[in-house]
């Protein structure tokens, strides 16, 4: 039944969503600095705490086994539609969700992602946009771990790279792009 809800399938009403964010008052759009004070946080979801508490946990409870199974099927792609809710802080957590919501507001972006390190952000970028046979064109030198990721790790999967000096002119960068030939340039980094 395609119209079944989460509650129909698991017998449990899904986690309540936070209250809608206030983005204007009296027809006047609030500035990001004002929105950052409370955006993405609903005190009723946190025992009435006025400010967002720090959630020092790595795992979250499911109401029953069926809800847990359905959630993991959504995360792993075994079921279409993804998964909502919290399960394990390596996927998401209340603090991370609020931070990402607020970064999106601050940057006027549709969404934002927070990572535990710069290298995890860089690796995610490359893995999301590069396929075997692609070329990454980048300025050089790079941080050693980034160069290692590009040359040694992505190189094993058929991703190539070309670099240009950090002070290169637009013409020099275009020359490096021509060197890439007919291959697909996945990104200029």
Over which residues does each language-model region extend?
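N-terminal glycine-rich, Lys/His-bearing helix-loop that initiates the first secondary-structure elements
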Residues: 1-83
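Conserved N-terminal alpha-helix of the aminotransferase class I/II PLP-enzyme fold
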Residues: 4, 59, 64-120, 145, ...
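Short helix-loop-beta connector
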Residues: 106-110, 130-133, 182
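Short acidic loop-to-helix transition motifs that present clustered carboxylates
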Residues: 119-122, 166-172
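Conserved PLP-anchoring active-site segment centered on the Schiff-base-forming lysine
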Residues: 128-146, 165
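A glycine-rich helix N-cap at a beta->alpha junction
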Residues: 153-168
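Active-site phosphate-binding strand-loop segment of PLP-dependent enzymes
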Residues: 168-189
């Amino acid at each position: 039944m395609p119209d079944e809800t989460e509650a129909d399938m698991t017998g449990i009403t899904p986690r309540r969503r936070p209250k809608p964010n206030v983005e204007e008052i009296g027809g006047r759009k609030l500035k990001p600095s004002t929105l950052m004070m409370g955006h993405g946080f609903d005190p009723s979801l946190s025992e009435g705490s006025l400010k967002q508490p720090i959630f020092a946990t790595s795992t979250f409870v499911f109401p029953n086994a069926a809800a847990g199974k359905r959630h993991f099927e959504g995360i792993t792609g075994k079921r279409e539609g993804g998964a909502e809710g919290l399960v394990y802080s390596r996927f998401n957590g209340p603090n991370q969700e609020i931070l990402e919501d607020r970064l999106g507001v601050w940057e006027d972006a549709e969404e934002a992602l927070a990572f535990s390190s710069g290298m995890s952000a860089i690796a995610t970028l490359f893995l999301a946009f590069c396929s075997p046979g692609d070329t990454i064109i980048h300025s050089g030198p790079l941080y050693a771990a980034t160069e290692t990721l590009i040359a040694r790790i992505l190189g094993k999967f058929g991703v190539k790279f070309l670099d240009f000096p950090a002070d290169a002119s637009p013409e020099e960068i275009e020359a490096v792009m021509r060197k890439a030939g007919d291959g697909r340039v996945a990104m200029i980094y």
